[in-house]
A protein has these predicted regions:
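Catalytic cores of alpha/beta
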Residues: 67-80, 158-162, 187-190, 210-216, ...
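Active-site pocket-lining/capping segments in soluble small-molecule metabolic enzymes
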Residues: 104-152, 159, 190, 194-247, ...
Length: 284
């Protein structure tokens, strides 16, 4: 589709005045022979194209996994040059998605990556011994939170301690992984506040659109579907029926969250805006 495909995704959403657009990043992929197989444009190019066409803040994802600290610095320098100063800082999955291994010469954890960004915000780059305010960047950093805990964490309490480390390292707000039970978000926020985390916590909502997602989403994202949602989806005979169930559930989630004065809503569209548009017309 090229850039026009991205524009075609964004254009129908403009009537809802989106406050920001997140842009995912993927590390290089290699086949068994070691040959690079990635066939997609870079995040910097996509972010710049969107920002300059729509004048809407873009939030590129910056990962530890798959990138050295030097590669990260070059990406951050490019983003700074383009005037893109909002980031979502993530550990990522690395090249092997089953077992996380940090890149040789890369940041091990999101907190380490945040410290690298904060160094650049003070004007200190990798080869510098001192800070130079004349070359300082001005990045604002969000981080990920997991209402049902990250799959690698032993417990939610342990995961929240890791989240606190990310906030202490420079995270200014939290965007949550998708969830389908609002009570888990409310409990997560309460635990975060008790742990001393005071930054905004933006809930992430993913509308279900396919029958297969009743099994796929819990497996991939280590989450649980509420019994009522799972039962309704398993009764569906077509993807259209599943999408109707998912749409109504997302509308219910969004309205309840907004009634609790959440700071914003983050929608996972996966480049398909139609379902989110239908939901937004009922919510906003």
């Amino acid at each position: 589709k090229g850039i026009e495909g991205i524009y075609n995704t964004i254009d129908p959403l403009l009537e809802f005045n989106p406050q920001f657009i997140n842009i995912t990043t993927h590390c290089e992929q290699y086949d068994a022979s070691g040959k690079r197989t990635r066939k997609r444009p870079g995040t910097v190019a996509v972010a710049a194209a969107i920002m300059h066409k729509y004048n809407i803040p873009v939030v590129p994802h910056i990962l530890c996994g798959g990138f050295t600290r030097e590669e990260t610095e070059y990406v951050l320098m490019d983003l700074n040059f383009l005037g893109i100063d909002n980031l979502l800082v993530l550990r990522g999955d690395g090249r092997n998605k089953d077992i996380y291994q940090p890149e040789v010469g890369g940041n091990r954890h999101a907190a380490d990556l945040l410290r690298q960004v904060q160094d650049m915000n003070r004007g200190k780059y990798l080869d510098d011994e001192t800070e130079n305010s004349s070359v300082a960047t001005n990045f604002n950093c969000g981080v990920a939170g997991y209402p049902e805990k990250h799959y690698s964490a032993a417990s939610l309490d342990e995961d929240i301690q890791h989240l606190k480390e990310k906030i202490d390292a420079g995270g200014q707000y939290i965007v949550t992984q998708m969830f389908f039970d609002n009570q888990k978000y409310f409990e997560f926020v309460d635990k975060c506040r008790k742990a001393g985390i005071t930054v905004p916590i933006v809930p992430g909502i993913k509308p279900i659109g396919f029958m297969s997602q009743v099994d796929v989403l819990p497996k991939i994202f280590s989450l649980q579907l509420p019994q009522a949602l799972e039962q309704a989806l398993r009764k569906c005979k077509t993807n259209e029926e599943a999408a109707a169930v998912g749409t109504e559930w997302a509308i219910m989630q969004a309205k309840e969250l907004m009634a609790h004065n959440v700071p914003s809503l983050h929608w996972f569209t996966y480049s398909d805006p139609a379902q989110v548009i239908q939901i937004a017309k009922s919510v906003y």
